Regions:
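Short, low-complexity N-terminal intrinsically disordered segments enriched in polar/charged residues
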Residues: 1-52, 200-205
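Low-complexity, intrinsically disordered terminal/linker segments enriched in charged
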Residues: 2-16, 138-152, 166-205
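Short structured motifs
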Residues: 31, 105-108, 141-142
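A solvent-exposed, acidic/Ser-Thr-rich amphipathic alpha-helical stretch
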Residues: 43-133
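Hydrophobic alpha-helical segments, especially N-terminal targeting/anchoring helices
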Residues: 50, 160-161
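Hydrophobic/aromatic beta-strand elements that line small-molecule binding cavities or substrate pockets
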Residues: 107-112, 153-159
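Structural motif
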Residues: 115, 161-163
Length: 205
């Protein structure tokens, strides 16, 4: 398997090709734009897909050890719940994760549910994580600057505001064992798909 950023929206784009319902097509396009603007490190475009005061909720947070909304809080590997609420806090989170490219992950989507009020994706998440981040979690690594691969099950829900058609929030459910053994999975250049950093497509209907 090659790490591939296009994996994150591949099933959504395939569904968009066949979906006839106008509202569902709009919802799919909004989620594609949201995900791909994250990957493109475009905070303004990411925020444009959200309501005025959005939230990000993460259960067994994939961001534990890499983003802590409460300044000075102790890093914990298996953070059971994290909530980032309001435009200022959510933008601050995206500024950080986009700067560090923390959303540059490979998501093998196994299930996709598209409804008028919510889109759900589930599958296997492959998360490139720095040695420095793993060290914060108490792992022993031979190179803090190198990237290591976390692997775990992942579910993400995108609920919509019915009036605006924008995303109310993002609800993320992460396998708490995602980083177990990650220090043994050091990523090599050959593990990435060709042009890994240049394949983001923001153009959607």
């Amino acid at each position: 398997m090659k790490l591939d950023l296009k994996s994150n929206t591949r099933m959504l784009r395939e569904r968009l090709k066949t979906e006839k319902n106008a509202l569902l097509r709009k919802n799919i396009s909004t989620v594609i734009r949201h995900i791909e603007s994250e990957i493109a490190n475009d905070v303004d475009m990411t925020m444009s897909t959200l309501v005025a005061e959005p939230s990000i909720r993460s259960y067994f947070s994939s961001l534990a050890g890499r983003y802590e909304p409460n300044q000075g809080s102790q890093v914990r590997e298996h953070e059971s719940y994290m909530s980032v609420d309001g435009a200022v806090a959510v933008r601050g989170m995206y500024d950080m994760v986009c700067e560090k490219k923390l959303v540059w992950s490979h998501f093998d989507v196994h299930n996709l549910v598209v409804d008028t009020h919510c889109i759900v994706q589930s599958g296997l998440f492959h998360v490139p994580t720095t040695g420095a981040a793993l060290k914060e979690l108490g792992r022993s690594v031979d190179d803090e600057a190198a990237y290591y691969l976390g692997i775990g099950n992942f579910v993400v829900m995108f609920p919509f505001d019915e009036k605006s058609g924008l995303l109310l929030r993002e609800d993320i459910y992460v396998d708490p064992a995602t980083y177990q053994g990650a220090e043994k999975r050091k990523i090599k250049q050959g593990d990435y798909s060709p042009n890994y950093e240049k394949i983001v497509e923001l153009a959607v209907e």
